[in-house]
A protein has these predicted regions:
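Polytopic alpha-helical membrane-helix bundles and their juxtamembrane interface segments
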Residues: 1, 11-29, 35-162
Length: 162
């Protein structure tokens, strides 16, 4: 996900004048793949205490949703599908699965995941409301910085989870 954030920020935004909209697709796809892997990890981690059928359902749904969102984003060249995939993947699946795990296990490492989710929401809000500092550090840049902080906390959570 860190590579996707940097790739999206550098190629997709900084060199937009040279690559056009198609320069954004590698960052979009890497980001969606990273979110899908986060989902798979959360589902697998949750299988310790979830019924098998629920884990299986979300595993199959994970394949369907990544394929659907990737095709929609490529066909329409609309970033909204990348955003929707991230909201679904990181909040509905990862956050909710890990919140349930936290309620059952009280694993302190999961607190960093909740902090990461907060930074992810901040990134989304910066982008949605176009909150930038100036024309040279606009909402795209601010949201990528918030995403980078979020990624740091996701990695920290992964290293501290039991």
């Amino acid at each position: 996900m860190g590579v996707a954030t940097i790739l999206g920020g550098v190629i997709g935004h900084a060199f937009l004048y040279a690559t056009g909209i198609y320069g954004k697709i590698p960052g979009w796809y890497l980001s969606m793949a990273a979110v899908a892997f986060f989902e798979r990890a959360a589902i697998r981690h949750g299988r310790k205490i979830l019924p098998y059928s629920i884990g299986r359902f979300f595993s199959v749904l994970n394949y369907i949703e990544i394929l659907t969102f990737m095709l929609l984003s490529l066909y329409t060249l609309n970033f909204m599908f990348v955003i929707l995939h991230s909201i679904y993947g990181l909040f509905v699946v990862v956050f909710c699965f890990m919140f349930y795990m936290y309620l059952k296990t009280k694993d302190p490492g999961l607190v960093n995941l909740f902090i990461a989710t907060g930074w992810g929401i901040a990134a989304m809000l910066c982008h949605a409301f176009q909150l930038g500092i100036n024309e040279w550090f606009n909402y795209n840049d601010v949201s990528h910085v918030a995403m980078a902080v979020s990624i740091y906390y996701y990695y920290k959570a992964a290293s501290e989870m039991k």
